[in-house]
Amino acid sequence: MKIKEGDKLPDATVVILEKEHTEINTSKILNKDKVILFGLPGAFTPTCSNKHLPSFLKSAEELKKKDIKKVFCISVNDPFVMDAWGRSYNLKDQITLLADVNGNFTKSIGAEFNWRGWGLRSKRYTMLLENGIVKKLVEEEGKCELTAADNFLKKI
């Protein structure tokens, strides 16, 4: 990944999934407070669905203790897929899903790859942001160990 700890997060347009699907600049949502952003290859994929996303749901209380104001999950998917995925977990306010529809954000941080020739995906990563500055960044080397919430929390 070309983004590093200490860098300011680049701005890109994504679709935020709240009450409605709304296009928004990442600077408006990720440049405030202390937040976690984790990226993953795709909604409904086995590791993302069985390990990565659930790890952040299970760690909600620990995240609050670390003064994390919000958790965001981003993937190169369309907003309808991300919305269905979020509803399948009944996320409520625990995790805000972001659809990086064309992969512009993912490309801007150098996290893109083409998985099995099936198209643009995001590498798996987790980062801690404070007012838009990357304070901690972990890129996954395996399936989902380093970037799972429990392991990431040990590093911050």
List each model region and its residues.
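Chalcogenol-based redox active-site neighborhoods
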Residues: 1-156
